[in-house]
């Protein structure tokens, strides 16, 4: 099973790529994290947020792995703990489908894409820099995996 992160946004600062890569490389081969950056739509004057999100939705849908479980990151999503994520990983692995985590652009994810998702997940109640989300998600996926392996990385 692969863990795909589809993130609207590109040309991130080097420290974002370094942070993401650090956690991605720690993952075992059977839970490899793959990042796909989606080029954001131009936010020209007169163009509505809905129009921008709809265009980004099409790009995300084109990049989605076939038959993947879709987890859309959204501020109104389920507020899971790290332990809940750790409990979900083995279940998802047994299911055999890849998991695609969707990170929207500046305006978020298109409502139709959120409706299509298998789950909406909130990363934090805090307002975070957009680029930081991919690093936090990669770290939490790594932490969740270490919990399933009784690895000492996670301490309570």
Swiss-Prot record:
Similarity section: Belongs to the RNA methyltransferase RlmH family.
What keywords are assigned to this protein? Cytoplasm, Methyltransferase, rRNA processing, S-adenosyl-L-methionine, Transferase
- The Enzyme Commission number assigned here is 2.1.1.177
Question: So which domain of life are we looking at?
Answer: Bacteria
- Any single GO CC term annotated in Swiss-Prot or TrEMBL for this entry: cytoplasm
InterPro entries referenced in this protein's UniProt entry, alphabetically: Alpha/beta_knot_MTases, RlmH-like, tRNA_m1G_MTases_N
Which residues bind S-adenosyl-L-methionine per the record? 73, 104, 123-128
- Localisation: Cytoplasm
Q: Enumerate the Pfam families for this protein.
A: SPOUT_MTase
Its taxonomic placement starts with: Bacteria, Pseudomonadati, Pseudomonadota, Betaproteobacteria, Burkholderiales
For this UniProt entry, the molecular function terms from Gene Ontology, in alphabetical order, are: rRNA (pseudouridine-N3-)-methyltransferase activity
EC supergroup of this enzyme: transferase
Q: Which reaction does it catalyse?
A: pseudouridine(1915) in 23S rRNA + S-adenosyl-L-methionine = N(3)-methylpseudouridine(1915) in 23S rRNA + S-adenosyl-L-homocysteine + H(+)
This one is known as Ribosomal RNA large subunit methyltransferase H
- Species of origin reads Paraburkholderia phymatum (strain DSM 17167 / CIP 108236 / LMG 21445 / STM815) (Burkholderia phymatum)
**Record function comment:** Specifically methylates the pseudouridine at position 1915 (m3Psi1915) in 23S rRNA.
Q: How does it assemble?
A: Homodimer.
